Amino acid sequence: MGNLSRARRVTAALGFIGLLFAVLGIIMIVMVPSIIKQQVLKNVRIDPNSLSFNMWKEIPVPFYLSVYFFNIVNPEGIIQGQKPQVQEHGPYVYREFRHKSNITFNNNDTVSFLEYRSYQFQPDKSRGQESDYIVMPNILVLSASMMMENRPGLLKLMMTLAFSTLGQRAFMNRTVGEIMWGYDDPLIHLINQYFPNSLPFKGKFGLFAELNNSDSGLFTVFTGVKNFSRIHLVDKWNGVSKVNYWHSDQCNMINGTSGQMWAPFMTPESSLEFYSPEACRSMKLVYKEQGVFGGIPTFRFVAPSTLFANGSVYPPNEGFCPCRESGIQNVSTCRFNAPLFLSHPHFYNADPVLAEAVSGLHPNPKEHSLFLDIHPVTGIPMNCSVKLQLSLFVKSVKGIGQTGNIQPVVLPLMWFEESGAMEGETLETFYIQLVLMPKVLHYAQYVLLALGCVLLLIPIIYQIRSQEKCYLFWISFKKGSKDKEAVQAYSEFLMTSAPKGTVLQEARL
């Protein structure tokens, strides 16, 4: 009896534990997704108390700017009317450092900030030195010539004489460092002296001179603390909610984020939209495929073929015109009226006539397409590669001798890649907190439920087995009683009806 009572207590305890496990598993199945969502919402918003705030304030991911220049092989031939020939030089790689300053939280659920960038040359990652010489179009001379195209002949003659006096030619031979960060040019001083405010710079002229040790404008974005539906969206840039560079309200709108984080809980139907001060416009990327980066699930977003399409191919882009061939965007209105164009490198995804007009271009998606890999649950970029090309439209301008017989062509100057990937301790922490722990909780809830069900079965089985034993004992006892009664009746029959000798013989038998 003691063993039986003890067994009952053990099975009852196991059943109680199983019930607790099962209930806990069910509660976790119901509650864990909601808890994870609340934690994500709490920690991706722009709040000094959130886990991602320091990452947003000073990006821990190493960014690199890789620059490729198109060296002009036949500058004199181009002036005489020949087809341009180019050779790609690079990459010249720079480490890009970013940090936010003047962070001000406003009363309308927004935060304002300036983001500063600085660059350091990385010789070990580069294919060449900043002292390398590159032959490229003289942007100042050719742009000024285009601006004078419809001016009186006397002004053109005066400009030709000024160019000659200052030693200016249609093509120049400068070092990579000068092209990137600026060089002294007497033409700049002359223009600023006689045509003040016509150029956005007063000193040296360089393609990236305005970006080094400077900010990209005052961004005001929504924090998501009070209204999560607008988290990271740009409210204003430099105090305005839309720009005035383009010819339609849609093209002038400042849409999306500042390009660093997006709203969490993305789906394949989501898109990535951001405002780029360098491109002077908002851009939208579209979902392509799922992937994995460092063990972290990602969504890859890429540029649609219509990103730089002209208005005849994609009517919503009509506001960015005047346009030339499809696949390049005229950015002259926000680049001191110089005939500059933005596109994918080597005119990838553009009208084929653009690449065919210049020898040495070989567009292909593997090398020249851009992408962003985003963790869909948090909206945080894991790996990105943004590639863009800057080109100059050049042609002969009658009356300006320096332009000679240059045939109309969109001539590529350079293309660059801004890339960054989460790595090291940052990647490990991100993986543990936002991938591993949710995965452990996900499996734990089902393990608890399964274990609870197994433990609940033990007392049930024990009870069934106990009832079976009682039944068998009762059956065997009842059967034994009937057998004894039959033997006794048979013996009495023999004693009363058979002769005595027979009984003795039967007994002996």
UniProtKB/Swiss-Prot annotation:
Gene Ontology BP, a term: triglyceride homeostasis
GO MF, any single term: lipid binding
UniProt PTM comment: N-glycosylated. The six cysteines of the extracellular domain are all involved in intramolecular disulfide bonds.
Membrane topology per record: Multi-pass membrane protein
The entry's keywords: Cell membrane, Disulfide bond, Glycoprotein, Membrane, Receptor, Transmembrane, Transmembrane helix
Cellular component aspect of the GO annotation: caveola; cell surface; lysosome
Residues with attached carbohydrate: 102, 108, 173, 212, 227, 255, 310, 330, 383
Pfam families: CD36
Organism domain of life: Eukaryota
Subcellular localization(s) per the UniProt record: Cell membrane; Membrane, Caveola
Cytoplasmic-facing ranges: 1-11, 462-509
InterPro entries: CD36_fam
Transmembrane stretches, start-end: 12-32, 441-461
Membrane topology, Extracellular segments: 33-440
Primary residence: membrane
Disulphide bridges, residue numbers: 251-384
Purpose: Receptor for different ligands such as phospholipids, cholesterol ester, lipoproteins, phosphatidylserine and apoptotic cells. Receptor for HDL, mediating selective uptake of cholesteryl ether and HDL-dependent cholesterol efflux. Also facilitates the flux of free and esterified cholesterol between the cell surface and apoB-containing lipoproteins and modified lipoproteins, although less efficiently than HDL. May be involved in the phagocytosis of apoptotic cells, via its phosphatidylserine binding activity.
Protein name listed in UniProt: Scavenger receptor class B member 1
Annotated organism of origin: Bos taurus (Bovine)
Lineage, top ranks: Eukaryota, Metazoa, Chordata, Craniata, Vertebrata
Gene behind this protein: SCARB1
